[in-house]
Each structure stands twice: as structure tokens, then as C-alpha cells.
Curated annotation (Swiss-Prot):
This is HLA class I histocompatibility antigen, C alpha chain. Glycans are attached at N110. Changing P208H: In allele C*01:02, allele C*02:02, allele C*03:02, allele C*03:04, allele C*04:01, allele C*05:01, allele C*06:02, allele C*08:01, allele C*12:02, allele C*14:02, allele C*15:02, allele C*16:01 and allele C*18:01. Changing M332I: In allele C*17:01. Changing T187E: In alleles C*02:02 and allele C*17:01; requires 2 nucleotide substitutions. Changing T20I: In allele C*17:01. The gene is HLA-C. Changing D138N: In allele C*04:01, allele C*05:01, allele C*08:01, allele C*17:01 and allele C*18:01. It comes from Homo sapiens (Human). GO terms for cellular component: cell surface; early endosome membrane; endoplasmic reticulum; ER to Golgi transport vesicle membrane; external side of plasma membrane; extracellular exosome; extracellular space; Golgi apparatus. Changing G40S: In allele C*02:02.
Length: 366
């Protein structure tokens, strides 16, 4: 049995690793399902993605030409055809179950058949450093709002409203929590251990962040200091700003950790400071890939800062030079045209412009 859920709220076989296996930190496996109804355009679309830690390893899309579970990581591609056939059938059963649930939910909320609605689920397990279940999850959301969730005890449910209480009574009558608990404590943990072993070069690596602090003047009186962490894995990281040793949490702008597109992550934290007091502020960073926490501060550049008015003046000069260049080119064209070579100058100008553009693009790509 498999289960899943949202942020606003998807494996039978033994893992082959002993319970004595240990890791430096905890690990997780999550399945995220989304079913979206689309009245007048066929059956609801169902998409499921699976993650081990921060790495996607499987995907299913009911709208695919040939819907099947698709590997998204090299270490799961080694699973045989029986595995993929079995997983595909589970996805298809889950898709059908979600279609029924969408119809039921529309009735619970007394909604018409005309609108589109969304059902999301997340399920999975966390594995502790001792190789045992740390926590299990099964949560659902409807139209972007929390609906029902399995509690941490893995024995009871929390319903968000009276409609969800209908579902809760059905789940309790079916003793669904017991089945989920067996899955989370057994199958989920066993497969997570297996994936961690098969993909250990990727999943159990720790890449430290590349760090620096940038300075962005806002006015004569204030500036923004931004502390950057780039190219790190896993995604869990802590960034904080301090002023004279005191946390500036309330005054810090902190973005969500973002994927970099190459399997690593990036994040930054920013704080607005009075000009001239930058050295009183320090950025503090903690990550699994660091031997010890880092403390960073802004290092003023040895190059002079160009004031805004200077930049504007420089741009104005460039514009004037560009205009003068165009005038000179036009005059040269007229002279050549008077000598019976009218088209060649225009063609040459286009050719030179194109070559310059190509070189620029090549440089950017490199």
C-alpha cells in the first residue's frame, strides 16, 4: 500500500540493509500526488513525484502518451521491469482512487460539476541516524487548503473541517491508520534504506556552500548586505545575521532554499544596515558540509565605488558616441554610394553587426 500529500497543502521487497546501518543524519522519502479535475475535458489529470531527501527519483503523469512510472535518478534505473510494472499499476490505482475522491469531495462541499478542483497528498517516512523510523507522514489538501492528516502517533487523524470529518469516519471504520502505520514502519523504511545504499554516492554526499557577502547601496544613509550560500547539498542550511553578536531575525529577509538546477541548492539572507556600520554585522552559516559554522562579513572592495550620477553621466556619453558613430557611418555610406557602390556599405554594416552579436552569444554561453 502506498500513500501521499501537499504543501498547502505518493514498494514491496526487502531493503537488504540491516537495522544496525547508521547514517550521519536523518533521511526522508516523500511522494507528492496531485489530481486535478477538468470538467468537459476528460478524466482528472494525476501526477505523482517521489523524492529521497532533496532528489527526485520517480515521476508518473496520467497525461503521458504511455503512462508509466519513470525513473528520474540513475540509482533507480537499475530496478528491473517487474519493479516498474508493479509501480505503474500502483500509480494507476491511486489515480483512479483520487478521481473517486474528487467526486466525493465535490459533494461534501456542495460544489457544482462545472469548476476545476485539486486534491493533493503527501506521504512518506523519515529515517533516523540509527536506521529506524523517525516519523511517518500522510497528509491531504483540497483546493489548496489542509483537509485531513495522519497524526504523529500514526494511530489517529486530524480533520480540518466538517467535510473532512466524513472522510475521517470512513478511514477509522476501515482501520486505515493501522495499514498506513504498517507501511510507514515497514515497506517505506525498507525501500528508503535500499535507495540510500544504491544511491549513496549522490544521496549521502555533503557539498559545502560557496559563500560571499555582497553590498548594495540604497541611499546615502542605508545599504543592503546580502549573505549568499551557493552550490550546497543537502538542502538543509541555516543563515542568520547578527549585529554586535545579537541576532537580527526580525530584520532579516530570508528566501526559501532554491534548487540550482545541477542537483545543488542556493539561498541568501539580507539585512538593511546604516551606511558606515557594515562591519558591525556578521552572517552566520551552518551546513552539514561545513566542518564548523562559518562567520562572514562584508569586505569592502579595493576598487572605488562609482556613484549613481557618474553611471548616468557615463551612459549619456555612450549614447552621444553611438549617435556620432551612426552619423559618421551614414556619411561614409553616402560617399560610397556616390561612387556607384550603394548597397555594399549597408550589407557590410549588417554583416559586422551580426558577427559581433554571434561573438557575444558565444561568450555568454561559454
Amino acid at each position: 500500500m502506498r500513500v501521499m500529500a501537499p504543501r498547502a497543502l505518493l514498494l514491496l521487497l526487502s531493503g537488504g540493509l540491516a537495522l544496525t546501518e547508521t547514517w550521519a543524519c536523518s533521511h526522508s522519502m516523500r511522494y507528492f500526488d496531485t489530481a486535478v479535475s477538468r470538467p468537459g475535458r476528460g478524466e482528472p489529470r494525476f501526477i505523482s513525484v517521489g523524492y529521497v531527501d532533496d532528489t527526485q527519483f520517480v515521476r508518473f503523469d496520467s497525461d503521458a502518451a504511455s503512462p508509466r512510472g519513470e525513473p528520474r535518478a540513475p540509482w533507480v534505473e537499475q530496478e528491473g521491469p517487474e519493479y516498474w510494472d508493479r509501480e505503474t499499476q500502483k500509480y494507476k490505482r491511486q489515480a483512479q482512487a483520487d478521481r473517486v475522491s474528487l467526486r466525493n469531495l465535490r459533494g461534501y462541499y456542495n460544489q457544482s460539476e462545472d469548476g476545476s478542483h485539486t486534491l493533493q497528498r503527501m506521504s512518506g517516512c523519515d529515517l533516523g541516524p540509527d536506521g529506524r523510523l523517525l516519523r511517518g507522514y500522510d497528509q491531504s489538501a483540497y483546493d489548496g487548503k489542509d483537509y485531513i492528516a495522519l497524526n504523529e502517533d500514526l494511530r489517529s487523524w486530524t480533520a480540518a473541517d466538517t467535510a473532512a470529518q466524513i472522510t475521517q469516519r470512513k478511514l477509522e471504520a476501515a482501520r486505515a491508520a493501522e495499514q498506513l502505520r504498517a507501511y510507514l514502519e515497514g515497506t517505506c523504511v525498507e525501500w528508503l534504506r535500499r535507495y540510500l545504499e544504491n544511491g549513496k554516492e549522490t544521496l549521502q554526499r555533503a557539498e559545502p556552500p560557496k559563500t560571499h557577502v555582497t553590498h548594495h547601496p540604497l541611499s546615502d544613509h542605508e545599504a543592503t548586505l546580502r549573505c549568499w550560500a551557493l552550490g550546497f547539498y543537502p538542502a538543509e542550511i541555516t543563515l542568520t545575521w547578527q549585529r554586535d553578536g545579537e541576532d537580527q531575525t526580525q530584520d532579516t529577509e530570508l528566501v526559501e532554499t532554491r534548487p540550482a538546477g545541477d542537483g545543488t541548492f542556493q539561498k541568501w539572507a539580507a539585512v538593511v544596515v546604516p551606511s558606515g556600520q557594515e562591519q558591525r554585522y556578521t552572517c552566520h552559516m551552518q551546513h552539514e558540509g561545513l566542518q564548523e559554522p562559518l562567520t562572514l562579513s562584508w569586505e569592502p572592495s579595493s576598487q572605488p565605488t562609482i556613484p549613481i550620477m557618474g553611471i548616468v553621466a557615463g551612459l549619456a556619453v555612450l549614447v552621444v558616441l553611438a549617435v556620432l558613430g551612426a552619423v559618421v557611418t551614414a556619411m561614409m555610406c553616402r560617399r560610397k554610394s556616390s561612387g556607384g557602390k550603394g548597397g555594399s556599405c549597408s550589407q557590410a554594416a549588417c554583416s559586422n553587426s551580426a558577427q559581433g552579436s554571434d561573438e557575444s552569444l558565444i561568450t555568454c554561453k561559454a
